Amino acid sequence: MELTLGKLPPEILKRYLLGMVGAPSKDLLVAPSIGVDFGVVRVGGGSSPSLIVSSDPVTGVEERIGWYAVNVSANDVATSGNSPRFLQSVIMLPEDADERMIARISSEMSRTAKGLGMTIVGGHTELTPGLKRPIVVTTVFAFARSYVTAADAREGDSLMMTKSAGVEGTAILASQAPGLEAAVVKRARAYFRKLSVVEEAAAAFSTGRVRAMHDCTEGGVLGAAYEMSYASRLGFELMEAKVPVSGETRRVCSALGLDPLRLISSGTLLLSVEKGGEDEVAAAVRRRAGSRATVVGRFLRRGGRRTLVRIQGGSEPVREPPVDELWKVLHRMR
């Protein structure tokens, strides 16, 4: 099978990675699984909290890489309904890196972690042969007595999302989009400030109406819907007409020939909400996080179809997770 840039396809993950967990342990409560953002480990008996762990790389961006690196892993842990607490990092720098690059990345990470109430506990930093730009990998930890995973959605649940589609991709690609007015580029670049889902995940979880959550990272809103449905073994119906897409995102995507529903969107949270709880979840997210939460579809029966219902009419089957639109642009730049 020919591999492409970005996440490995599910069949490759299943064939080579998911079963390779080393020594089995009865303390592994949530094992590696496609579409699930984190692992969970029992660290004590009785009522002791469990340890939630997630890792993520930042590979496609250099500007504000420290900000992105902290937020993407913090977001994954936050989809459990719990606040991220501790972080470790691996920072791999290109051979031409200087002390200014090191200072910039480390200070960005420290400020971002402090803003989220997280402590950096260690890591590793090096100059790595062959790199053209830095790569930062972060691992984030939290302690939890209760949690949800992306595998807990149920048939009939409403599919909701926060903010709008393509948040992270809009910030990353704004400067690459030809023909945009300076004011549009400036507003789009500022989308990096929307990258965190920590507060909105906590707000939604606090209602008791949320069964599953997933961060819309690589593959965007459509990719996250696929992964959540795959993890929960359900079908889904995503209504393109209901997915919020900001004016800046539309302009950036139009200029670059991209689909906003398939564009990386850290900062957008996908939720599986029990029927009747939609208004309560939307109100909680608005009150605590200042974000909107919108119903954009629904989960279908076990093994049901996975479908994107297009604005112009008709439906499009979603048989595999989409390749992120960001990779198209990066491929053109190679």
Q: Predicted regions: what is each one?
A:
Residues 30-33, 216-217, 235-244, 262-264, ...:
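Beta-strand->loop->alpha-helix junctions that form or flank phosphate-binding loops
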Residues 31-33, 41-47, 113, 128-133, ...:
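Solvent-exposed alpha-helices and their adjacent loops that cap or buttress functional pockets
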Residues 73, 105, 109, 225, ...:
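Aromatic/hydrophobic pocket-lining residues that form π-stacking "cages" and hydrophobic walls in ligand
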Residues 94-96, 190-265:
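Active-site-proximal betaalpha loop/short-helix elements
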Residues 143-196:
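Phosphate/diphosphate-binding glycine-rich loops and adjacent basic-rich segments that engage nucleotide
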